[in-house]
Amino acid sequence: LVGSEMCIRDRIKIETTIDYKDIKGFPTSTVPGHKGRFVFGYVDSVPVVIMQGRVHYYEGYPITDVVLPTRLMGMMGAKKLILTNAAGGLNTDFNPGDFMLISDHIATAIPSPLIGTNIDELGERFPDMSEVYSRRMREIVKEQADKLGIKLREGVYVQLTGPQYETPAEVRMCKILGGDAVGMSTACEALAARHMGLEVCGISCITNLAAGLSDKKLNHKEVQETADRVAKQFTELITAVVRAV
């Protein structure tokens, strides 16, 4: 899965692309920077499918539709899922442009994608979530970042609903809960993937400091500009991780 304005498409030998709008009944992306298509191909000899743009809960879709692309990739045979996002920094040691490896998440502000009748073919009714983000994959990301000379942070990601940015009071709440970064995606997809038994890792690009931690007002343009600035490093890291896992 590829988040806001972060794409490794240029490193892939592309076999085919499929637009979400061409799949009957499939949710489509409406956010600038999210192209809304699957890209199928290879990184070296590794077969990959990339979700170039995701759908968000705040776009009005039920949470089960938000994770439908994740479910579909698992049903197509994907065994490992690399989730990325643009996030606001809660940890005051972070700077815009930093990458944060997700060690765990807090997702109590959104409905679980597992609510409702369980589909036993996908996974068990009460799945364990003590290690949502694979320790093995996290070590690989750290190793590859070190080889590339990329500074990598690590921390807890908080998913809120959006689309509005967080208030300073909400930011303080997230920090008290132990969050290091906050955003509007990713955790729900990780839950659905783990339910299906996929191995998951997640990386946040810290595109801005969360509300109340700087004098700047938040806007989506800043998110895109920061993501653009670090896109090359991001591409190098994700490509190296795909080769290594």
Regions found by a protein language model. Give the residues of each.
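Short, small-residue-biased leader/transition segments that mark boundaries at the very start
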Residues: 1-8
